[in-house]
């Protein structure tokens, strides 16, 4: 009996070790996948493949404490060569999704900075009003004028883009329309932006008037359950028995926002087999191309969206592509 118990004990101990090793290995794999997410997004198009890779710049990071408790800190990612060179770089400010902080998006924002952008994030977990984006621009203006700052006279304030995920969608729309620095925004990107159905339900600063966004705008979302839902219009209430679910950013919402946008260059597209949680990662290459096109005049990047045969119109991983160019 003692031998049997001893054998069982050994088996249990070995199993525990194996489980521990497995969990550690899975943890390392998950960490690596998050840090190198761009290797797992399955790029197909030539432009998508190019901008899914890291850019040519190493990336430096600097943090600033905010006087606003909701914002907490600002984190700025920038091309490391700015530590030793005097040149200006365009800007992208990022608006977090609900409950997310800057570190949720670290690898994603470093990727963007590696393509030549000064990228600003913060720890605001409720970004919808756009106030924290506006505060980020205040910080950039201050640092650009500060002779003691590593970013002194290196921030191209004439080329500012904003992007946001989920609740960050209303944030960028509100930043571009009602915040004090709205007139400094050159282009807007929103991935899985909260639909008007939900913003009306939530109230409290969630609502936005996208018809007042007067700069080029890219709208993206996934086709899976939480983003797409099953509802086909804002008029349908979620009804589990009837099989109706209002997704966070369904196709009808993309169509509605595209239609309401004024006479500006605009695009919407969905990626197949993608859902809300990591949609920002899945669209990263085309987001980078969008900002490169509008903030650095990268003509090749623009071919993803416009022209006789825009890449997104033929990329098999994407659907429902629609574009308008003046």
Predicted regions and their residues:
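Short amphipathic alpha-helix adjacent to the substrate-entry channel of hydrolases
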Residues: 103-122
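Gly/Ser-rich "nucleophile elbow"/oxyanion-hole loop immediately N-terminal to the catalytic nucleophile
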Residues: 83-88, 131-171, 178-179
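The feature captures the conserved acid-bearing segment of alpha/beta-hydrolase catalytic domains
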Residues: 185-277
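Conserved hydrolase catalytic core segment
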Residues: 175-185
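N-terminal Sec-pathway targeting helices
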Residues: 1-17
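Alpha/beta-hydrolase-fold serine-hydrolase catalytic core, especially in secreted/extracellular enzymes
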Residues: 2, 263-265, 271-326
